[in-house]
């Protein structure tokens, strides 16, 4: 068969499928995102993913292993030194990250906070890991009274700055975040993203606005997306994909509100005539349920995703390729609130499969990028091995 005209890549953010061989190095022995969610739910109901071979990769309670899976399947091990969103996604597109982005479970160093205060002329309050909505309830009034900046982080490598739009105008908020971005380029901080988190409203009824702005790092090298764009292929980035790559290699960015909207936008974008990559990240699994250690919410979100998947599959043309994977784990039964170092599932589907098979375990997420590059006949990434011939 000929090569594929369109590749649809769905990253189920944080949907790991069992501890990686090096889990001990990351304090993640025993982590199993999908397995533990299924146990907690007394079985997951995901008939579509079951038919694609999900439980053939590793037994998952409630999901039957398929005698005749419709898709090729295996699992992938992360090669880079990290377990965060940016590391996982950058590796998928052909990079290898040696130095992990830093996380700040105890807040940011005093030295950084003092520099930020000095350069912005405003005091900092908060400086700890927190939920964005909860920290507004806790510190919003104080911020309005004093004009201090609410600085907080999460389990990811992010520095977030929240400010009321009537207290600190948007332009000043963005300027403050640019200062923070500049300061955190220093290797001793190496923060993945600085995020402006503007809000409005009164105490007890604060509301974050759509004026959020991300100041990411550019990928540390050229990705497969850069090669696609430079060779006049389309790269549609859905959800937070454009932010993760700081817009590099993106020809069109489509924002999404949540997982449900992500699947709606994906479905709509399938009506477009394009040649290249359509890349969607479904962040709710991670942000709403993994970090908050909510296995039931996570399980229900997985089941909803599974319900929406048939519509996507039905819309695939004969020269379309669908790849479903993840970027790391986030086991909601595991200790702490951080990501977990796990294998991730890899499911590869197209309409022309006559006999689906188990693929060899991938030693790097970059095999996906290599396969996409191979398909479109562009420069292969330095890392990764194409499995294109195995799936035709």
Curated annotation (Swiss-Prot):
InterPro entries, per database record: Alkaline_phosphatase_core_sf, DeoB, Metalloenzyme, Phosphopentomutase_DeoB_cap_sf
Pathways per UniProt: Carbohydrate degradation; 2-deoxy-D-ribose 1-phosphate degradation; D-glyceraldehyde 3-phosphate and acetaldehyde from 2-deoxy-alpha-D-ribose 1-phosphate: step 1/2
Cofactor dependence: Mn(2+)
GO MF annotation terms: magnesium ion binding; manganese ion binding; phosphopentomutase activity
Positions bound to Mn(2+) 2: 286, 291, 339
Organism superkingdom: Bacteria
GO cellular component, one term: cytosol
SUPFAM superfamilies on file: Alkaline phosphatase-like, DeoB insert domain-like
Class of enzymatic activity (EC top level): isomerase
Main location: cytoplasm
EC id: 5.4.2.7
Subcellular location: Cytoplasm
Protein name per UniProt: Phosphopentomutase
Gene designation per UniProt: deoB
